[in-house]
């Protein structure tokens, strides 16, 4: 995965409006074409600018191990978990909004993989 696909999968800024977090996840997973053949089990959208998230790979993050970095700051995000449906267009998600720190993988100072939401 590269920086542009990371942005498509994980960055939504400013946050797309939806009637509720579940509807938000259903909409975004479809709009970003993240379920081409099967419903993705889980996906997190971060509501911060690409430059803010990119900083986690540098001064805005703390090295964890290998190429993984933990953000120093918390980000507004929506965590989407699959609860059924069928790909590509009717996957159903349970969305949970929150403000949390994140762990990402970096290559050449750019985020390339979303590892997890830190509790």
Swiss-Prot record:
Its EC number is 4.6.1.18. It comes from Iguana iguana (Common iguana). The keyword Lyase applies. SMART domains: RNAse_Pc. The keyword Iron does not apply. InterPro entries: RNaseA, RNaseA-like_dom_sf, RNaseA_AS, RNaseA_domain. Keywords: Disulfide bond, Endonuclease, Hydrolase, Lyase, Nuclease, Pyrrolidone carboxylic acid, Secreted. Monomer. Interacts with and forms tight 1:1 complexes with RNH1. Dimerization of two such complexes may occur. Interaction with RNH1 inhibits this protein. Belongs to the pancreatic ribonuclease family. This is Ribonuclease pancreatic. GO terms for biological process: defense response to Gram-positive bacterium. It is found in: Secreted. Substrate binds at residues 40-44.
